[in-house]
Swiss-Prot record:
The modification Phosphoserine is found at S166, S171. This is Acyl-CoA-binding domain-containing protein 4. Pfam families: ACBP (PF00887). The gene is ACBD4. Keywords: Lipid-binding, Phosphoprotein. The keyword Phosphoprotein applies. GO terms for biological process: fatty acid metabolic process. Residues 12-101 form the ACB domain. Residues 156-167 have a biased composition (Pro residues).
Amino acid sequence: MGTEKESPEPDCQKQFQAAVSVIQNLPKNGSYRPSYEEMLRFYSYYKQATMGPCLVPRPGFWDPIGRYKWDAWNSLGKMSREEAMSAYITEMKLVAQKVIDTVPLGEVAEDMFAYFEPLYQVIPDMPRPPETFLRRVTGWKEQVVNGDVGAVSEPPCLPKEPAPPSPESHSPRDLDSEVFCDSLEQLEPELVWTEQRAASGEKRDPRNSPVPPTEKEAAAQAQCSAMAPWAPRARAALLPPVALRRPVALPNVSDPKEVTVSGGVSAAN
């Protein structure tokens, strides 16, 4: 009985790895990129499936993107790893269906759905584009339409079966170093600041901002820092020159010979 309950696990693991591979290999400048909310869900399911429940402390206020990611992961609570893998696969199906429904098939490259090839091999109910679109393309797409999925060659981008890392091997700052589904900063780095400015009505101060300043801001800061040591000297150079004159001896108030005592007798006498 135990074997029957554990039999679906290898299939779920294989589908999960295929979905992770698809997200990892999506082109940055392709016709479709997952939204910020979708990437947050992918990130939280991936962390839950590989590391289990969130046990690390929440990042500080200076790391707003890290706090969004932590909140998404922590919201899953005690969801099991198998449930997280299944949720990841379900989210991948929704993304594929969204691509089919929203991206005009006549304007996309014919090899766009090649990125979903690993999913068609391991997920039977994976959403597929219309057959009229697939018929225009040769290779693996025709085999998928004909049902000959096994004849398709194994994709080289499938990752190996890595063992789930233990929570002890990850520090809080290591959470941003994963390759899979952890590219929120590359998608919309200014989204958090836009939301914060809209809420507070304040402008971003690059001196107190956790986001690195732009090249223009960095150049201005560097110029100010370079001029700082010369500020006193430059100020001194603007002062008017002061002429140094030779001191002149003051004249004697009175001649000793002319000073007399109150009695009329001269002091010299």
